[in-house]
């Protein structure tokens, strides 16, 4: 029996490739969000993109006519803060972090209580990678130097998300997973990823809103991050074909959604 969307109250929405592409909001997204509210539900924008803060996303959605507040977002940057705090006990106990990431990502980490440095010569304790739209070769070189140096094995290697590419209007650009891939090839070290497909972000959203797993639906365009996150979090998921993933990908994927839809408009018609 196919899942009934009308039973769902919490909708976890991926962003890039699911509700918009670059600065173009997909048709039906605004109506979908309004319908969720009318039905007494809640939606959380849940993105693996760590290059922007919640404030950045609020401003971006506002230009598309979508009103949102900080509590409407769970980003992979939030997952990083949650994960590092779980591992080290507190942000202050994590030591110095060398970040391969944007200024916006760095600002959020500092706001959350972490110490960020751009000097690899200092006593760095953690190498952290995100989706870095400000990437330089020096950052990559510094990251490799840290992991291969005398203290390399004692340095924690973490990353926001394993996405290989980010969809844009002209196709794709390298995402965090590709950046980490270069470092892994050079050093043999793999990072621990905190974002999707790990269940952490979905669990954070459910805890924040108070909805159960049975009441939750995750909607995304990537099988290996979005749909895998749904499986790992033990919640239903919807695979939309408006972004990276295709039906051909679905045929061979170990990650299977509860439903497949061309785009958000199809879900709206079933509510």
Language-model features and meaning:
Residues 2-13, 20-38, 52-74, 81-271:
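Asp-based, Mg2+/Mn2+-dependent phosphohydrolase catalytic module
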Residues 49:
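Conserved phosphate/oxyanion-binding catalytic-loop motifs
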